[in-house]
Amino acid sequence: MKKYIIKGPTNSISGTVNINGAKNSCLPLMAASILFKDKVILKNVPLVKDVITMKNLLISLGSKVEISKTNKMIIKNSKPHKRRVPYKLVSTMRAGVLTMGSLLGRSQKKKIYV
């Protein structure tokens, strides 16, 4: 990582900084997307194992999920979601429980294995 040290008085500093996406903010947003019937677009999505697992979990529930080469994720929830979250997917990451609130809000019933 580059580091810049600025000494003394300066008139102004300006520029652009690229911030990498964070898994810990992306997973709750993916889970919350279940609440929306329109498409949800997430940009700068980190392609780490938990994000891919959550993508597969959403697909298993009935969502359509696309990820572009520019790390933009499009989630579509036009059809009703299944009420049962597959144990195989939930058991590989703790973030699977994040879907509970969204599924309860959308369908008033949910089954999850813990």
PLM features: what roles do these ranges have?
Residues 1-114:
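Short, structured segments at the rim of ligand-binding sites
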